[in-house]
Amino acid sequence: MLEQLQTLKSEAETQINEAADLKTLNDLRVKYLGKKGPMTEIMKQMGKLSAEERPKMGSLANEVRTALTEAISSKQEILETAAINEKLKSETIDVTLPGTAPSIGTKHLLTQVIEEMEDMFIGMGYEIAEGPEVELDYYNFEALNLPKDHPARDMQDSFYITENTLLRTQTSPVQARTMEKHDFSKGPIKVICPGKVYRRDNDDATHSHQFTQIEGLVVGENITFADLKGTLTVLAKTMFGEEREIRLRPSFFPFTEPSVEMDISCFKCGGKGCRVCKGTGWIEILGSGMVHPNVLEMSGIDSTRYSGFAFGLGPERVAMLKYAVDDIRHLYTNDLRFTKQFQSTETGEI
């Protein structure tokens, strides 16, 4: 039986290798491995062997069957590939093959950063408020404690459309509109205001005539500076790491009093001083402060009863710092070599 198995294996492998088409190969499968084939006959004869020979010959027979099965599968794959190639040569289009999948975009880096901040604030009970990008001069300046003759207006050149309308230079007008219509019987104001803003800046590595801002506003009874500091601490740790510390420096903004700028401990050097933090150990992130009483009163809010805080930051700056982007223009030029480095996995691949 040993010689019979060896002869069968050699003969079958030779014929399998020489098979020129799938029909011939299938005939060989039936011939050698079918119910009436030699392998089946050999397996039936196992019962006639002695108890000592049966395990050895049974194992050998199984090895031969496995070898022939694998040889047939391998040859089948070769013949199928050859058949497809031959068919492709004779047809302009093979409609049975899968088509080329379209490229699917992912969320832009800025969108990812904005949504990360939105998710954080929504988790803290904030709502998202929006307003027009073509804004009235009143809401962009006067309602924010910047009357027409205020010297602080020179701090930001604006794109005026008419004498009283312009492209908003900040998302703060959304805060003014929100305060005007808010009903405090339904609770305090807790909103963030993301959106595009426009300023007459010359485009360079750190400036753009159009960019995005996210501003936050909380107004209610007994809102204190401690509430502002706690909120900014959560923001810094969420966006830049739990180990971040914050530093608040006195500053000036017409719509807040007192006003502060927030720095975070450098995430690159841990506060030791490096190129990113310019050797100081700290990186400036945003401006903030307690809402000026004049701003509250202009919105019809009793400043003796209600207080609040506001803050504002640029997602571009957050993205540039967090992901080591050295030129703001990379965020807007739509160069796939750049954007592919920050692919989101939510919607597929670029």
Swiss-Prot record:
This is Phenylalanine--tRNA ligase alpha subunit. Tetramer of two alpha and two beta subunits. The keyword Transcription does not apply. It is an enzyme of class 6 (ligase). Coiled coil: none annotated. It comes from Listeria innocua serovar 6a (strain ATCC BAA-680 / CLIP 11262). Mg(2+) binds at E257. One of its GO terms (molecular function) is transferase activity. GO terms for cellular component: cytoplasm. The lineage of its organism: Bacteria, Bacillati, Bacillota, Bacilli, Bacillales. Its main location: cytoplasm. It is found in: Cytoplasm. Binds 2 magnesium ions per tetramer. Its EC number is 6.1.1.20. PROSITE patterns: AA_TRNA_LIGASE_II.
